[in-house]
Amino acid sequence: GDADLSLRFDLTVPLAKYVALHYADLAFPFRRYQIGKVYRGERAQRGRFREFYQADIDIIGDGKLDITNEAEIPSIIYQTFSTLGLKRFQIRVNNRKILNGFYAMLGLTDKAGDIMRTVDKLDKIGAEKVRTLLIDEVGVSAESADEILKFIAITGSNDQVLSALEGYAGRNETFDEGLDQLKTVVKYLSAFGVPEENFAVDLTIARGLDYYTGTVYETALLDHPEICLLYTSDAADD
């Protein structure tokens, strides 16, 4: 007929429909996992496919989820990879509230999404080209671009990065909330048995979609950087 049809883009929309239909029958927080084929209408190239398997792990709350749930997912990533015999992998953790709060300190709240999407290209194009894009395309000043690159370049042990972030605390409520959440996630990841060699606070991690509101993660094989990200995860309040 004339019906508009499409192949399944992801496993998230079907999950949202399922929760909406069975809301009264579910016990919250509702945990589930699913593996299935999904499809993307993009140009096929190395590391990008039009058809592939996606594995989803989700925790759905009836209201606001406790921050400890945001540490549960990366601990499952660690258990999964370890069970598969993979050892040299790293779960990179950040919090969107930290980024939004920092950009608000610079007076760039309205450009935060564009900044994050530009910074997301750092591994591919390098810091100098990211700086150029921030100035020429996003429209931030050269001074702000330098502040952004300085901020996302903070590295070290997890304790060292968190300590450096303390230097920015007290100037923005959203930033402070994100920092508290990130500290809690790091604490619980250790409590759940994830070695620090397998997870790191990484301020370049943002994820591309604006509905991500809290903890964000990406996972990569350290010995095979040419392989695209194997596992990504994000927290969303809505």
Which positions does each model-derived feature cover?
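Positively charged, Gly/Ser-enriched RNA/tRNA-binding surfaces
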Residues: 2, 10-87, 97, 133-229, ...
